[in-house]
């Protein structure tokens, strides 16, 4: 059985927004958060595109092999009204169900992703998605799992490498998080992995991830305790997939063929993606016209997936 885990935030939930702003102001005053950290506070991080229903339609149309979809939200009020909560293939999971209590509430995708292995009922084989990762054409199971292992790109590298194998030349918080992760991997394995963050669906083994989480739980929770928001002290969930490769627990291949990553903008011709299997439609601070781009994207997705899925209420 193969499950999919997807995270979702409803920015229009006033209670959630008030809570977000409370912790943001508190941590800025305490010096724990940088108000200029766009990785935590940029409007593009949680801007509402209203395309989640099309994500579910893509799953139903193109990933018939999926056992269940685990929708991760902070609490019950974050669940979309149109969602068919009684559908047997849908499992709604709240942060309190799998994240350590001392870290709650959290608004940090890094923290949330690190604790996915704690989710009860989750199958051993699962795929992690964001809500902007779309399956546009039929996908076979062996794209993600082959020979009993998750499929990942081969990005193992030699010990002596340029700049020690770390990302340089930027103060971007996310790059610092990636470097933290690379350094931690080297510390515990004496091996290095190339920068390998792919903003597309990623295959996991719950059994393996849980073994790593349990073994290094003190180090991981320490990294996540500093702030409620993404910050330079975090590790990222790519820790699990990098270690899969280091410990030879992955099948090496290319799950991302005929797929791409797109930074959204108003001048994009979405028909370009008609022959793509998977696409990440990524929001950025450089987006020039949100409303126009949103309309064009929704029109494209509605044309691609015009029929409701069983994940949606009938009425």
Language-model segment annotations:
Residues 1, 11-44, 154, 160, ...:
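A solvent-exposed, charged loop/short amphipathic helix patch at secondary-structure junctions
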Residues 26, 58-66:
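Short, acidic, metal-binding catalytic loop of nucleotide-sugar glycosyltransferases
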Residues 48-60:
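Short, well-formed alpha-helical segments that are part of the catalytic scaffolds
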Residues 32-43, 47, 77-122:
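Active-site-proximal specificity loops/subdomain of glycosyltransferases
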Residues 239-315:
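Long, low-complexity C-terminal extensions of enzymes
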Residues 77-78, 115-160:
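GT-A fold catalytic core of metal-dependent nucleotide-sugar glycosyltransferases
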Residues 151-231:
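Long, charge-rich alpha-helical interaction segments
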Residues 3-6, 59, 68-71:
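Hydrophobic targeting segments
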């Amino acid at each position: 059985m193969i499950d999919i885990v997807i995270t979702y935030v409803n920015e229009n939930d006033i209670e959630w927004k008030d809570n977000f702003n409370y912790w943001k102001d508190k941590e800025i005053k305490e010096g724990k958060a940088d108000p200029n950290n766009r990785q935590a506070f940029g409007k593009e991080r949680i801007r509402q595109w209203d395309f989640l229903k099309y994500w579910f339609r893509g799953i139903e149309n193109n990933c018939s092999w999926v056992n269940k979809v685990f929708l991760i939200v902070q609490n019950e009020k974050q669940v979309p009204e149109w969602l068919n909560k009684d559908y047997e293939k849908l499992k709604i999971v709240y942060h309190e169900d799998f994240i350590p209590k001392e870290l709650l509430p959290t608004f940090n995708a890094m923290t949330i992703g690190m604790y996915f292995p704690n989710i009860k009922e989750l199958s051993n084989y699962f795929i992690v998605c964001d809500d902007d990762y779309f399956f546009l054409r039929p996908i076979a199971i062996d794209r993600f799992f082959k020979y009993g292992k998750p499929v990942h790109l081969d990005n193992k590298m030699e010990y002596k490498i340029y700049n020690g194998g770390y990302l340089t030349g930027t103060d971007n918080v996310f790059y610092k998080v990636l470097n933290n992760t690379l350094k931690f991997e080297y510390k515990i394995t004496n091996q290095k992995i190339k920068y390998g963050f792919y903003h597309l669906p990623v295959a996991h083994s719950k059994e393996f991830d849980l073994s790593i989480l349990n073994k290094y739980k003190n180090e991981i929770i320490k990294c996540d305790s500093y702030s409620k928001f993404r910050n330079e002290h975090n590790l990222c969930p790519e820790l699990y997939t990098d270690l899969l490769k280091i410990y030879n627990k992955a099948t090496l291949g290319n799950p991302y063929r005929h797929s791409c990553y797109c930074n959204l903008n108003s001048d994009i011709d979405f028909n370009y993606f008609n022959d793509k299997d998977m696409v990440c439609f990524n929001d950025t601070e450089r987006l020039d016209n949100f409303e126009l781009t949103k309309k064009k994207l929704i029109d494209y997705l509605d044309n691609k997936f015009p029929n409701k899925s069983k994940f949606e209420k009938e009425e």
